[in-house]
């Protein structure tokens, strides 16, 4: 039996991560799910939030802005709309994005404006949480 997984995180722009890991935790739409070596194959949609993995006794955090996770043959492939390692997140920029989203939400007149502002707020807050976990 395998004792590790290969985790690959890909966005439309780049390969964010490709490494051997011991565990992956990801933000699914029905809540967080975890993946250990020798997990059964499955495919899941990802919500905006914190993906984390354990490797070498350390926990590493990555912000993901939705996407999909596929598990098969001890490989976890994450196709994310965007992804940032915790150490790469500019906390001040995330705070400003949160403030802008809150202002837009307060001024939203249409449902579409409100939905966009809510999504922007959710992304900014998730980025701040991920950065704080690093």
Swiss-Prot record:
Main location group: membrane
One MF term in the entry's GO annotations: ATP binding
Keywords: ATP synthesis, Cell inner membrane, Cell membrane, CF(1), Hydrogen ion transport, Ion transport, Membrane, Transport
Gene3D superfamilies: ATP synthase delta/epsilon subunit, C-terminal domain, F0F1 ATP synthase delta/epsilon subunit, N-terminal
Gene Ontology CC, one term: proton-transporting ATP synthase complex
Compartment list: Cell inner membrane
Superkingdom of the source species: Bacteria
One Pfam assignment: ATP-synt_DE
Signal peptide: none
Membrane disposition: Peripheral membrane protein
Role noted for this protein: Produces ATP from ADP in the presence of a proton gradient across the membrane.
Subunit structure: F-type ATPases have 2 components, CF(1) - the catalytic core - and CF(0) - the membrane proton channel. CF(1) has five subunits: alpha(3), beta(3), gamma(1), delta(1), epsilon(1). CF(0) has three main subunits: a, b and c.
UniProt similarity note: Belongs to the ATPase epsilon chain family.
Identification of the protein by name: ATP synthase epsilon chain
Organism annotation: Nitratidesulfovibrio vulgaris (strain DSM 19637 / Miyazaki F) (Desulfovibrio vulgaris)
Taxonomic classification: Bacteria, Pseudomonadati, Thermodesulfobacteriota, Desulfovibrionia, Desulfovibrionales
């Amino acid at each position: 039996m395998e004792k590790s997984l290969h985790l690959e995180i890909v966005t439309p722009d780049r390969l964010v991560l490709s490494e051997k890991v011991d565990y992956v935790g990801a933000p699914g739409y029905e809540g967080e799910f975890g993946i250990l070596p020798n997990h059964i194959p499955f495919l899941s949609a990802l919500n905006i939030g914190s993906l984390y993995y354990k490797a070498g006794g350390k926990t590493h955090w990555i912000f993901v802005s939705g996407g999909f996770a596929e598990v098969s043959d001890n490989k976890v492939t994450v196709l994310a709309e965007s992804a940032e390692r915790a150490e790469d997140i500019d906390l001040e920029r995330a705070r400003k994005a949160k403030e802008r989203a809150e202002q837009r939400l307060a001024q939203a007149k249409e449902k579409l404006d409100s939905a966009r502002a809510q999504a922007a707020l959710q992304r900014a807050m998730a980025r701040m949480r991920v950065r704080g976990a690093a």
